[in-house]
């Protein structure tokens, strides 16, 4: 067997092992009528990354807040709730990255309504990705009147990041905007605007009972303060003159 053949066999096995080593989709009850779904993906430079989203139940209907990373896990998530008697009424994506939108194409193929802001759809189109079938504009949007509110605090992690507020439960899904322990991937971030956006979010939802970030543990409203501090720190660091290379 040639060295090249051995290399490709090793590469294939490594990829297969990495895929098999990803944890299974997790679905956990957070509050009455609110579930956290957690999917996992191998991300270059970051290793295996967990991503949280929500499923909100309104009577016999279920709404997805962000899809899992993949179509496969999105199908698993939908099936889990359908088997328990719920109709999947729609999905909303909090920004254009794949950890929020990876299941849109599968949902569209099943005629399940998908929602995103006009800006998110524009960014998806720019990237050659499948767009949500429904879009909205403005700072506020009610996915379900008095039950599921979407709010745009301004640019931060991405230009289009929105959060989702559940007023009856006082639960805020902050998604990838909430970064209490470090700003993470800054590839599409607006460092200059993030502190102002974070301050607005803190003032609006400072009495939230629970705050759900995308990539760290669920916490209380203190995560809003920590995110603001990280955003300010990131802005200050961006203003420091770079050290000359030797």
Swiss-Prot record:
One of its GO terms (biological process) is response to antibiotic. Pfam families: Lactamase_B (PF00753). Inhibited by captopril stereoisomers, Hg(2+), Fe(2+), Cu(2+), chelating agents such as EDTA, dansyl derivatives, including dansyl-C4SH, bisthiazolidines, mercaptoacetic acid and by PMPC phosphonates. Inhibited by 3-(3-mercaptopropionylsulfanyl)-propionic acid pentafluorophenyl ester, via a covalent binding to Lys-179. Not susceptible to inactivation by the beta-lactamase-blocking agents clavulanic acid or cloxacillin. One of its GO terms (molecular function) is beta-lactamase activity. Its cofactor is Zn(2+). It is found in: Periplasm. Keywords: Antibiotic resistance, Hydrolase, Metal-binding, Periplasm, Signal, Zinc. Zn(2+) 2 binds at residues 99, 176, 215. Its EC number is 3.1.26.-, 3.5.2.6. NCBIfam families: bla_class_B_core, bla_subclass_B1, blaDIM_SIM_IMP, blaIMP. The class B beta-lactamase family has a specific amino-acid numbering system known as BBL, for standard numbering of class B beta-lactamases. A multiple sequence alignment was used to derive a consensus sequence and then the consensus was numbered taking into account insertions and deletions. This allows use of identical numbers, e.g. for active site residues, despite differences in protein length. UniProt always uses natural numbering of residues, hence there appear to be differences in numbering between this entry and some papers. Class B beta-lactamase which confers resistance to the beta-lactam antibiotics, including penicillins, cephalosporins and carbapenems. Acts via hydrolysis of the beta-lactam ring. Has penicillin-, cephalosporin- and carbapenem-hydrolyzing activities. Has endoribonuclease activity, cleaving substrate RNAs preferentially between U/C and A, in vitro. This is Metallo-beta-lactamase IMP-1. It comes from Serratia marcescens.
């Amino acid at each position: 067997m040639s060295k090249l053949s051995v290399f490709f066999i090793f590469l294939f096995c490594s990829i297969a092992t990495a895929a098999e080593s990803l944890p299974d989709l997790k679905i956990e009850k957070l509050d009455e009528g609110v579930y956290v779904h957690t999917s996992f993906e191998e991300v270059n430079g970051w290793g295996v990354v967990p991503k949280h989203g929500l499923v909100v139940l309104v009577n016999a209907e279920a709404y997805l807040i962000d899809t899992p990373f993949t179509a496969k896990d999105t199908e698993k998530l939908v099936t889990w709730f359908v088997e328990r008697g719920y109709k999947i009424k729609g999905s909303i994506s909090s920004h254009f990255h794949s950890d929020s939108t990876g299941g849109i194409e599968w949902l569209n193929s099943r005629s399940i309504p998908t929602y995103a802001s006009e800006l998110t759809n524009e960014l998806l189109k720019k990237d050659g990705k499948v767009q949500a079938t429904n879009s909205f504009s403005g700072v506020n949007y009610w996915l379900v009147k008095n039950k599921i509110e979407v709010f745009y605090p301004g640019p931060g992690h991405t230009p289009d990041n929105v959060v989702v507020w559940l007023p009856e439960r006082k639960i805020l899904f902050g998604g990838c905007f909430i970064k209490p322990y470090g700003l993470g991937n800054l590839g599409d971030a607006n460092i200059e605007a993030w502190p102002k956006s974070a301050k607005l979010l803190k003032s609006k939802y400072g009495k939230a009972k629970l705050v759900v970030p995308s990539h760290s543990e669920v916490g209380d409203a203190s995560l809003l303060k920590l995110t603001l501090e990280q955003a300010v720190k990131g802005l200050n660091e961006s203003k420091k003159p770079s050290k000359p290379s030797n």
